[in-house]
Design a protein with these regions (language model features):
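Negatively charged, low-complexity tracts enriched in Asp/Glu with abundant Ser/Thr
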Residues: 1-26
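A short, charged, amphipathic alpha-helix used as a generic interaction element across diverse proteins
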Residues: 4, 58-74
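Intrinsically disordered, low-complexity segments enriched in small/polar residues
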Residues: 16-18, 42-43, 66
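Short aromatic-glycine-(Arg/Gly/Cys) micro-motifs in beta-strand/loop hairpins
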Residues: 25-52, 70
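Residue-level signature of transmembrane alpha-helix interfaces in integral membrane proteins
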Residues: 30, 75-76
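Intrinsically disordered, low-complexity linkers and terminal tails enriched in Pro/Gly
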Residues: 37, 76-77
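A short, polar/proline- and glycine-enriched secondary-structure boundary/capping micro-motif
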Residues: 53-57
Length: 77
């Protein structure tokens, strides 16, 4: 999975765009974000300017799958 297919899957599942940031641009506060930093993929939640949750992955695929699973699980609650 890559960022593009992640976006398609999130839209297909009905996850609202305000719940995530896939570009690293624009608003990222109070949403789950994914970014490539220093050759690694980071998935984090930013709250009031502080990363309250941060997972590091070696591949885009692993990061995207984790983010998808996390957003889908949050929606089911």
């Amino acid at each position: 999975m890559n960022i593009r297919s992640l976006k398609q899957e999130l839209e297909k599942y009905g996850i609202p765009a305000y719940a995530y940031n896939l570009t690293g641009h624009g608003r990222n506060d109070e949403r789950l974000c994914i970014e490539k930093e220093h050759g690694e993929w980071c998935v984090y939640y930013l709250e009031r300017g502080t990363k309250t949750f941060n997972k590091i992955f070696d591949s885009e695929d692993a990061a995207c799958r984790f983010m998808y699973d996390r957003l889908v699980a949050d929606r089911k609650r």
